[in-house]
């Protein structure tokens, strides 16, 4: 039986009360042209609505620049919650018992990051991905008790990270040794590495994916390092870990320390920051882990609570013997990352990673067919890739910008041997129309 709430008599009585003679008169403010619309477009999800509104912005440019900072769709709820007064601070509380809500959130963040990386322990965050890598190198030397003062660093590690790493560790008499990458594959040549003398080295850094977007042979590199008594420091993109093998499962024993940039997890691009670094490690090394650690415990009445644990490692307890001088960390960004991961869940994060990879592969294939554009490396990629241009890369970037496209990151300064190399990034924010616009713009220039 159909549910009909109002009979014709009911409608007439209601119209009489409000002084309208008919339904048409009641809705006379609606333009008559709209009355004959037969088709209403299908509904959009939040990401679709965001893209629709951004297209109406006259100066909005399509951004295909990655190089360590990535544009992903961030649900509106993330920062709506993160900027509530209860969370809106960068500080980790010193008096743990006074801020149980904040500590519980950080504890949940640590749990999710440890699970995502398949590691035992996570800290509460570090300043950014570059300083996290430097902290990981210092941690490796401490674990080796200073007997090894050399860190092996592939040239395929983010060049900005390498500069920060060198600036910090070389002041402590730790040598950074650069390992060249294979010019055709874009990754560490594992066969050449096997012939390398690893004596006196504390650790090797393994990026995944590397700066070129290529996927390193992580299992082979990890097993080689452990066979030569080196620690393995994994520097990873957290979004990629939703698709790829997590560092804790690399090789036979897994990575020893994992670090990286947390910006892809719900933190928007903002002229370089603030972002946040993350770090995880094996349980055996937790006392050398820098930064705050939140633990779960019970009080004397048996009630569950959260507290800052292992504080003897930190500078506010023993400054001269602290594992680091990380003070405020990036608590607010961690709040956003926790909300982001909670909203997306494992399935949602995997969908973001898969969409980024799929769209990147699509653009790679499109550009491979453009005259004057050639792929540089043959290794599998995640969501970035390198092409070589016939024309000077600066001219191409300027011409693309005039057409509303930030086309990528020039490799000319950091990797001059690659010539007119261009690093291009594609994420889940890019549609098929965006990829076509990039292809057509590049064809018109080349």
From Swiss-Prot:
- Enzyme Commission no: 1.4.4.2
What molecular function does GO assign, one term?
Answer: glycine dehydrogenase (decarboxylating) activity
A GO biological process of this protein is:
glycine decarboxylation via glycine cleavage system
Q: Provide the species name.
A: Coxiella burnetii (strain RSA 493 / Nine Mile phase I)
Q: Which gene encodes it?
A: gcvPA
Name the top EC class.
Answer: oxidoreductase
Report the family membership: Belongs to the GcvP family. N-terminal subunit subfamily.
Q: Which UniProt keywords apply?
A: Oxidoreductase
**Which Gene3D superfamilies does the annotation name?**
Aspartate Aminotransferase, domain 1, Type I PLP-dependent aspartate aminotransferase-like (Major domain)
Q: Where are the transmembrane segments?
A: none
Protein name in UniProt: Probable glycine dehydrogenase (decarboxylating) subunit 1
| Oligomeric and partner information | The glycine cleavage system is composed of four proteins: P, T, L and H. In this organism, the P 'protein' is a heterodimer of two subunits.
One Pfam family, please name it: GDC-P
What is catalysed by this protein? N(6)-[(R)-lipoyl]-L-lysyl-[glycine-cleavage complex H protein] + glycine + H(+) = N(6)-[(R)-S(8)-aminomethyldihydrolipoyl]-L-lysyl-[glycine-cleavage complex H protein] + CO2
Functional note:
The glycine cleavage system catalyzes the degradation of glycine. The P protein binds the alpha-amino group of glycine through its pyridoxal phosphate cofactor; CO(2) is released and the remaining methylamine moiety is then transferred to the lipoamide cofactor of the H protein.
Which InterPro entries does the entry mention? GcvPA, GDC-P_N, GDC_P, PyrdxlP-dep_Trfase, PyrdxlP-dep_Trfase_major, PyrdxlP-dep_Trfase_small
